[in-house]
Amino acid sequence: MGVDGYVSLCSVGGMLLALLASSFISDGGCSVDAPTPSPAIPTGLASKKGSNSSTVDGGPLATVPSATSPNTPRTQRALVVLVLFSAAVVIYFVIRAVRTRIKNKKTRKYGVLDTNLGNMELTPLEQDDDDDDTLFDSNQPRSQLSLACILQTPQFPAHVISIRKGTSQCNALWVM
């Protein structure tokens, strides 16, 4: 097993290559039968002529070469191995695509989370009030806001800090 539970392509390819090599090696010990002689002239016609009996009995014209190659089993086996290897590669990539798609759905469950917060600009909600106060302004660095605002506000659990645009003033809004 490879990283993230995937079977590496090298190990699958290596196994299929070993299978292909073993199929060729195992064919080396097998004997291939010679093509069977077939009469050039049908036996019924040869008996009627009588003088051409030497060609029917085994002369140079007596055998017709077979249309099938003696390497047919080896070729078929190589083709089967090639098809199986191609199918294994296709299945591997399909499973990999499905797994990555499932992982992407899990990460997108709550929306886009990998954006850079420094580049994000938040605008205040439209309100009927004529206040310039915003509850949060992402354009100001956190280092300016954090210590100064915390030191200026009383330490009660129910308060909200609002920041006036363009300034570093902190105003505490009390929530009761």
Swiss-Prot record:
It comes from Xenopus laevis (African clawed frog). Pfam families: DUF1180 (PF06679). Residues 1-31 form the signal peptide. Residues 41-71 are annotated as: Disordered. Glycans are attached at N52. Residues 99-176 are cytoplasmic. It is a single-pass type I membrane protein. The chain crosses the membrane at residues 78-98. One of its GO terms (cellular component) is membrane. The keyword Zinc does not apply. Its main location: membrane. This is Membrane protein FAM174. InterPro entries: FAM174-like. The gene is fam174. It is found in: Membrane. The lineage of its organism: Eukaryota, Metazoa, Chordata, Craniata, Vertebrata. Residues 32-77 are extracellular. Keywords: Glycoprotein, Membrane, Signal, Transmembrane, Transmembrane helix. It comes from the Eukaryota. Belongs to the FAM174 family.
